[in-house]
């Protein structure tokens, strides 16, 4: 591993989340560098007013590697992630690592990602996300956002952009030449579609459970109102993905209709004191309704206000 001379570019995308970004950059400045690699860092700001530039300027002197700032004027998740790819290719990167601007990376984060990446010979690796929930979070929130690790170095189907590293062969024009799909700019799931496109071309992904990032949840994201909106949007986006690939439409639609019918049937009993919390049933109904809306063309712009 020490003689590989891989060049890793860490890409971070941000939009109007200044305080979390400061914590993210502070943690990044303290990471260990994998032996035998060159590491560089790219921050892509989706704010046309370059609102994150002053934060970048304040932290670059603490970084143990070269840093670059870019403003991407085209709004959306796919646009900023593709900008990371384009700039990383210009830097002749052999691998790209990504995490989110509301996350804190562990000191050994990059070392662990790279270790599994090299040992497995895979095209990409996915790390572990620990969610730091607000104090007094409900049991429902804790159940919906569990902290768990995948077993070491197993095959996975998703390369989540909140904690991953992948070979530039996936994105190089001379390789698989995959990009994030602009159709999912504001809906999310752009990393799921990216992963599917890579898998369809024969790519292999592995888990790197010791590569840890910590995501801080705000109080707003722990409210039932937020969860309703998020689950409805997720249902819509799942339908968008299914329509994009035209697979599993009929079977999934039948499943969602039956899910709505069943949960509407049992909901009155839950409200009267059943053993299961009615909130969970309401969320599942909401997600199923989102799927049906997405099936008929409705879209969600959940990520218009920020980049996750």
Task: Enumerate the language-model features and the residues they cover.
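Short, well-formed alpha-helical segments that are part of the catalytic scaffolds
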Residues: 17-31
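A recurrent flexible, glycine/aromatic-enriched loop bordering the glycosyltransferase active site
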Residues: 149-166, 185-187
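Non-catalytic, C-terminal membrane-associated alpha-helical segments of glycosyltransferases
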Residues: 229-234, 246-308
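Glycine-rich, basic loop-to-helix element that forms the pyrophosphate-binding segment
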Residues: 72-90
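Acidic donor-binding loop at a coil-to-helix junction in glycosyltransferase catalytic cores
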Residues: 185-196
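Conserved donor NDP-sugar-binding/catalytic core segment of glycosyltransferases
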Residues: 108-138
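A conserved acidic beta->alpha catalytic loop
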Residues: 43-56, 103
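Short beta-strand-to-loop acidic/aromatic patch adjacent to the donor-nucleotide binding site
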Residues: 92-104
């Amino acid at each position: 591993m020490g003689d590989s001379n891989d060049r890793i570019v860490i890409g971070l995308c941000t939009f109007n989340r200044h305080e979390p970004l400061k914590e993210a950059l502070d943690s990044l400045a303290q990471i260990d560098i994998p032996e035998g690699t060159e590491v560089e860092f790219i921050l892509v700001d989706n704010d046309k007013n370059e609102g994150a530039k002053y934060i970048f300027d304040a932290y670059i002197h603490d970084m143990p590697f070269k840093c670059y700032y870019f403003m991407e004027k085209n709004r959306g998740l796919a646009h900023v992630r593709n900008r990371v790819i384009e700039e990383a290719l210009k830097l002749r990167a052999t691998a790209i690592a990504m995490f989110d601007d509301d996350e804190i990376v562990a000191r050994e984060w990059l070392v662990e990602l790279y270790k599994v990446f090299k040992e497995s010979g895979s095209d990409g690796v996915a790390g572990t996300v620990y969610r730091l929930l607000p104090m007094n979070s409900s049991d429902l929130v804790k159940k919906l956002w569990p902290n768990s690790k995948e077993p070491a170095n197993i095959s996975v189907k998703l390369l989540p952009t909140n904690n991953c590293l992948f070979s530039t062969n996936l994105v190089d024009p001379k390789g698989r030449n995959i990009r994030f799909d602009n159709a999912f700019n504001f809906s999310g799931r752009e990393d799921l579609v990216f992963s599917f496109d890579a898998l369809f071309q024969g790519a292999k992904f592995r888990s790197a459970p010791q590569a840890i990032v910590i995501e801080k949840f705000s109080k707003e994201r722990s409210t039932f109102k937020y969860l309703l909106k998020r689950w409805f949007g997720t249902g819509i986006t799942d339908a968008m993905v299914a329509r994009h690939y035209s697979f599993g439409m009929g079977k999934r639609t039948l499943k969602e209709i039956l899910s709505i019918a069943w949960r509407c049937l049992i909901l009155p009993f839950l409200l009267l004191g059943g053993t299961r919390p009615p909130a969970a049933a309401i969320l599942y109904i909401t997600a199923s309704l989102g799927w049906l809306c997405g099936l008929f063309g409705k879209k969600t712009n959940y990520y218009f206000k920020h980049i996750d």
